């Protein structure tokens, strides 16, 4: 470890580049600067960041099963009760929109209520400049993703610097996440729904933590963090992205890096090869959903000169 994006023998090359290349030094220094307040606070108040992770915290409502509507647009039912808080799943595939037709302003991590148990949030209406109580919808995943990305960046900085304050910050977030997600199951619904997000596309928001695990594994072992639940959670991510998500547009391609990261993180070689096979050679498409392997994707979705067969303005 690490073994997905880099290996340990790459570290000296990266550090040399940081020392000699201005662009690399700026990325390194700006990342440290961005993380400094979180990592420093974590030394004396680790619950600050953990309590702002959006979870189902109320006993009796620590949901384990989620059901979407027939179109996979929104959640319509919550079931089960875990012995610990579970990860909140975005209730809708879209961001919340004001009556004036504009997106509400998403709160910063600092503005999230610690250990919030409500299913709604006070969000700023940019038109009226007033806060309104609404369902945060996709902002649930957005907020958690921002915390996931902080953990990933801290894990990389730990690997590069050896500073254990980065490792502890990232490891505590990762530990809370995996021990919550292990109680949860892929959403019940059509082929577009995901595991920890209403859409399979949204499950890529877990990728930063999967990659953080790769950088943190020796630290997690050394400090006695439980590792027993990681394989279960990583396999659920890999399974979801292998057999769900649209294969009739760019979804399968957008999801593939998360699928590969989850598969490469599995400790069982047979399972690792099984899920990697769906990226490398075996299609799983059924009723328009699943994973197209690289050979099929190249044949179906790329022009002879290597262009993706969707219009350039698709995302505008």
PLM segments and residue spans:
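Extracellular glycan-targeting catalytic surfaces
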Residues: 1-264, 276-284
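A compositional/structural signature marking long, glycine- and acidic/polar-rich segments
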Residues: 261-316
């Amino acid at each position: 470890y690490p073994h997905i994006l880099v290996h340990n023998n790459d570290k000296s090359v990266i550090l040399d580049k940081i020392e000699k290349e201005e662009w690399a030094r700026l990325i390194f220094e700006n990342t440290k600067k961005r993380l400094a307040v979180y990592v420093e606070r974590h030394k004396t108040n680790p619950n600050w960041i953990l309590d702002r992770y959006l979870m189902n915290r109320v006993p009796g409502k620590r949901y384990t099963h989620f059901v979407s509507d027939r179109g996979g647009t929104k959640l319509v039912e919550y079931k089960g009760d875990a012995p610990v808080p579970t990860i909140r799943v975005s209730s809708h595939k879209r961001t919340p929109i004001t009556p004036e037709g504009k997106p509400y302003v998403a709160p910063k991590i600092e503005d999230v209520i610690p250990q919030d148990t409500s299913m709604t949030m006070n969000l700023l209406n940019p038109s009226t400049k007033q806060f309104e109580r609404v369902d945060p919808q996709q902002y649930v995943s957005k907020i958690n993703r921002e915390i996931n990305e902080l953990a990933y960046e801290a894990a990389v900085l730990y690997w590069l610097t050896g500073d254990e304050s980065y490792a502890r910050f990232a490891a505590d977030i990762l530990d809370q996440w995996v021990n919550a997600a292990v109680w949860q199951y892929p959403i019940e619904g059509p082929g577009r729904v995901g595991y920890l997000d209403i859409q399979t596309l949204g499950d890529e928001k877990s990728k930063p933590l999967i990659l953080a695990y790769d950088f943190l594994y020796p630290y997690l072992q050394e400090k006695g963090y439980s590792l027993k639940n990681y394989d279960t959670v990583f396999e659920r991510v890999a399974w979801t992205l292998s057999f769900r998500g649209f294969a009739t547009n760019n979804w399968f391609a957008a999801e593939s890096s998360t699928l590969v990261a989850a598969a490469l993180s599995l400790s069982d070689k047979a399972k690792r090869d099984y899920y990697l096979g769906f990226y490398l050679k075996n299609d799983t498409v059924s009723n328009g959903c699943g994973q197209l392997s690289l050979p099929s994707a190249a044949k179906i979705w790329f022009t002879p000169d290597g262009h993706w067969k969707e219009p350039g303005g698709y995302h505008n």
